[in-house]
Amino acid sequence: MKTLYDKLWSDHVVHAESDDPNGMVILYIDRHLVHEVTSPQAFESLKLAGRKPWRTGSILAVADHNVPTTDRSSGISDPVSRLQVETLDQNCEEFAITEFRMNDERQGIVHVIGPEQGATLPGMTVVCGDSHTSTHGAFACLAFGIGTSEVEHVLATQCLVARKSKTMLVRVEGDLPPGVTAKDIALAVIGEIGTAGGTGYAIEFAGSAIRSLSMEGRMTLCNMAIEAGARAGMVGADEVTIDYIKGRPFAPQGALWDQAVAYWRTLKSDEDAVFDRMVELKAVNIKPQVTWGTSPEMVTTVDGYVPDPADISDPTKRHDVEHALGYMGLKPKMPIQEITLDKVFIGSCTNSRIEDLRAAAEIVKGKRIAPNIRLAMVVPGSGLVKSMAEKEGLDKIFLSAGFEWREPGCSMCLAMNDDRLLPGERCASTSNRNFEGRQGPGGRTHLVSPAMAAAAAIAGHFVDVRSFIR
């Protein structure tokens, strides 16, 4: 009667404070992913205490937040960004930690390179000083983000003090309609339960629609679990999982592979498992989604309208909508497809994998971006994704359409590097957060799938991507 979360949790409890199932425990961590933003203070504290990382073989490091996505031959211009990247390089060199440096082809966004390298394996506990570590739960992992002090704890002890979450099952049954993607499922779920709906929970995604997703799609879904307030998101292991991992650099080989696969096939919730909460959606009812406000829960369908605060009875919610519309520069009851755009960003740890780029390229092939689009950019999630896309000719498709083809990194997902919105600019983005100022002070972000972003770039405004593929 165990859920997948229960199995992963119990397998990693080193010590329990009491018999209380909701009490604090010491949890063992299998894989520690590290980037340049949340690790410098952790390493510094470790050194001041005269300690060394306990198990360097569990760590994989990469710089992603601050790296430029344009020409890298002259290095990083911003002194703070440069210092963070150089500090990561120095710490990894000092402690013999595996790191993919800025000019290594394997460099990329930490939540792209972990699975890509086979460093994320079913049954693991995976942590990183980054909110969207939940991405790795797509591999039947218990994966979650941690703070800088916890990064130090894991470096020093390979363990964390933690409290068990409640469990939520999000079941999506049926076949997804053409033009509807994992990103649309994620936004539809968040629209249904809200950004606080998953608070205190670990979400497992299941159902025939989820099983039909590729690993890239499952990663997108689990990546967005944190935006529903959840501690973690996960999908049970199956043959899709196993096929994706096989042959990757960090994956087990030979007899160890056979042993691992036998174990991985057990990593799913039992048929009679009991969850604390269940949410059910029918795939056939899900349409392409577009956020209109300043929170991922402020979302509607592409054929929908901006809400009217006058129709909302709850005064707090009404105020939130009024404030969001003011910031976003939108009018009540405005059709989503009348929202014009300035920029388009295809990338981030949510949607920068090869499947995402293929979907966007399919839409823009043989077309040109609209005259009002000041910048449309594609930022692959890793050097290996970029190389694969170039071998398939996707870069030429994007360049011919008027897109910029960039180097891998977090890029315009957040205003921590040179890629950002100017005040008042409006962007269709495949990233995960549309908070005020997320992509730059005063920037206005609308979250969509890669295909929807590509279609918006061509039209100059939001348009139903389904009209492109019929």
UniProtKB/Swiss-Prot annotation:
Cofactor: [4Fe-4S] cluster
SUPFAM superfamilies reported in the protein's UniProt record: Aconitase iron-sulfur domain (SSF53732)
Catalyses which reaction(s): (2R,3S)-3-isopropylmalate = (2S)-2-isopropylmalate
Enzyme class: lyase
Annotated GO MF terms: 3-isopropylmalate dehydratase activity; 4 iron, 4 sulfur cluster binding; metal ion binding
Listed Pfam families: Aconitase (PF00330)
Recorded metabolic or biological pathway in which this protein acts: Amino-acid biosynthesis; L-leucine biosynthesis; L-leucine from 3-methyl-2-oxobutanoate: step 2/4
Cofactor note: Binds 1 [4Fe-4S] cluster per subunit.
Keywords, in A-Z order: 4Fe-4S, Amino-acid biosynthesis, Branched-chain amino acid biosynthesis, Iron, Iron-sulfur, Leucine biosynthesis, Lyase, Metal-binding
GO biological process: L-leucine biosynthetic process
Residues the record lists as binding [4Fe-4S] cluster: 349, 410, 413
Domain of life: Bacteria
E.C. designation(s): 4.2.1.33
Functional note: Catalyzes the isomerization between 2-isopropylmalate and 3-isopropylmalate, via the formation of 2-isopropylmaleate.
Subunit structure, as described in the record: Heterodimer of LeuC and LeuD.
Family: Belongs to the aconitase/IPM isomerase family. LeuC type 1 subfamily.
Name of this chain's protein: 3-isopropylmalate dehydratase large subunit
Source species of the chain: Nitrosomonas europaea (strain ATCC 19718 / CIP 103999 / KCTC 2705 / NBRC 14298)
